[in-house]
């Protein structure tokens, strides 16, 4: 599971998800990419589930890059606990995603295989996504 080795602050405020991504919004490593169309939190488990879906479809061929990392800790209080008595314990780690962020990249496979692999991965994610190709982004 993805999580930071060390953090300065264990418990973070939730924050607001506004605006679009400027950094990390273009394909940098591979030929094809999966881009977020909505804002949201993607948990470490969801990132891993989507990665497994991609690798199972691609099998031996191709290289995959994960472009997001879960830096933010989400806290939860135990069930049936009264309010107060401090903030809950860190429960999971999430990546904060803005519209336009490239989530995954891939190369070494055909366009049809990449599109299908990213379609399977998108079903594991809680946000809307779209398929990117380097040839489409270079022209525009």
From Swiss-Prot:
Coiled coil: none annotated. Keywords: Ribonucleoprotein, Ribosomal protein, RNA-binding, rRNA-binding, tRNA-binding. It comes from the Bacteria. One of its GO terms (biological process) is translation. Binds 23S rRNA and is also seen to make contacts with the A and possibly P site tRNAs. PANTHER family: 50S/60S RIBOSOMAL PROTEIN L16 (PTHR12220), LARGE RIBOSOMAL SUBUNIT PROTEIN UL16M (PTHR12220:SF13). Belongs to the universal ribosomal protein uL16 family. Part of the 50S ribosomal subunit. This is Large ribosomal subunit protein uL16. It comes from Syntrophus aciditrophicus (strain SB). The lineage of its organism: Bacteria, Pseudomonadati, Thermodesulfobacteriota, Syntrophia, Syntrophales. The gene is rplP.
